[in-house]
Amino acid sequence: MKEPSEVAALAATLTIGERATESLLTVLSAAQLVEISASTVGLTDIAREYLLSESPFFKGALFQNISNDEVDLLRKVHLQDDVPRPITTQWLAGRVLKADSQAQVMHAHSFAAASFFAQQPVFQQVDRILDVAGGVGSVSIALALKNPHLRCSVMDLPPMAALARSFSERFGVADKVAFIGQDVFSSEWPAGYDAVILSNVLHDWDHSRCKALIQKAFHAIPVGGRIFVNEMLLNEDRKGPIGPALFSAVMLLFTEGKQLTMSELAALLELAGFQQAVASARFGYYSLVTAQKLTEHPEGKRCG
């Protein structure tokens, strides 16, 4: 692509889906290799310097070991829309592949940011938190360590809940963190909580399932209750930052979802009935977004 191209035409040329095109362009924009303007995309000066064959600094040889067969497989398996994704397909069937290793990955992924967010004063204003799709309870463990008054319940698939107890015992909070082994989509959520937390959850799911989770959260808590969402947010122009952009590309390979912008997340929260959505704290690329249930009946706007 030497000249600017329409995004739709580029997707057709690459024979990949709309979601894959959006994800790849976000990464390339964050890496300063393409410029996106309205519905067109073009190469930056840096890209022209290193990625065009007529340049003396062309780096194409670095990629020549990737065979056409491998590219074809990647396109067919991962870059088309509506292709089953290996991780979320298993989760929807109630299975967790390699649960032990997934538990370690989830804990490593979540615990540092959770430990920072757990220090925020807002957690002094809640008593019982439902940690939805909370894995082995890394976020709840961090919350319990920093807020001794809190009682948390982690709801996730039974294979993950079965592993979780060893994590809470390791950190000495087994009496403050309980585990509920059930599917978050098909099961009724338990009552008696004044807050729900979705930490590194929404990026796994498509728009309709994100809406379903947030709506269930709204109905699970009383008026005055809160929702907390921990995610890496993209800039509003979806051109970065590089960390969330790359993570969104990883989601493309294994899940149904993608990273959201703050306005996209706020629209989902508002649609469910939550109000006053704000990114109340940041840790690295992560944001803790909070919103409140101020009325029993949702009056949110449509968001697609």
Residue spans of the language-model regions?
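Conserved Class I S-adenosyl-L-methionine-dependent methyltransferase catalytic core
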Residues: 2-5, 12-13, 18-127
